[in-house]
C-alpha cells in the first residue's frame, strides 16, 4: 500500500469546528484521484476480501468509485446503497448516524440469502457500516466480509456489532498530519 500511504502523508488536513479533517482522493474525491492509487486499493481489496459473494455493496457516495472498480475487476455485480428514496419494490430504508450527521439511506436489489461484500472508503465512526450491516441482516443477506480502504483508529459503532472490518491501512489524524499505524 505504498501509494496509499504516501498519498495519506501528502493529504491536506483542515480544521472543521475543532476536528482535524483529512482531505484525500479516496475518501473525498479531491485532490484528483490518480488511477494508479485506485488500482492499488482495488488490488489490496481483492487480496484481503472474501470474494465468494453474490454482490458487492457500497454506500453512496465515496464507496462507489472503489466498488465500481472492484466490480469491474471481479465481475461481481454492484449494489449502491443510496441517499435518495425511489420507492421501488423491495426498497429497504435504514437510518444511519455518524459522528457528524444523521440521514436515511435506501437499499434495493438485495434479497434473503444473498452473500455480500461491503466495501467503503473510510471507517471513522462506524455509524454508516453498522447501520448497513443491520439492515442487510434484517433483509436476510449474509455479510461475508467488510473491507475499507482507510480506517481511523479508535472505537466505532461497528465494535458494538458482530461484524469486523478489514482495512488496507489504519491511521490517526491530527493538526500535524496523518500517522500510519
Swiss-Prot record:
SUPFAM superfamilies: PRTase-like. InterPro entries: HGPRTase-like (IPR026597), PRibTrfase_dom (IPR000836), PRTase-like (IPR029057), Pur/Pyrimidine_PRTase (IPR050118). Keywords: Purine salvage, Transferase. Its EC number is 2.4.2.-. It holds the Pfam family Pribosyltran. PROSITE patterns: PUR_PYR_PR_TRANSFER. One of its GO terms (molecular function) is transferase activity. May catalyze a purine salvage reaction, the substrate is unknown. Belongs to the purine/pyrimidine phosphoribosyltransferase family. Archaeal HPRT subfamily. This is HGPRTase-like protein 2. The lineage of its organism: Archaea, Methanobacteriati, Methanobacteriota, Stenosarchaea group, Halobacteria.
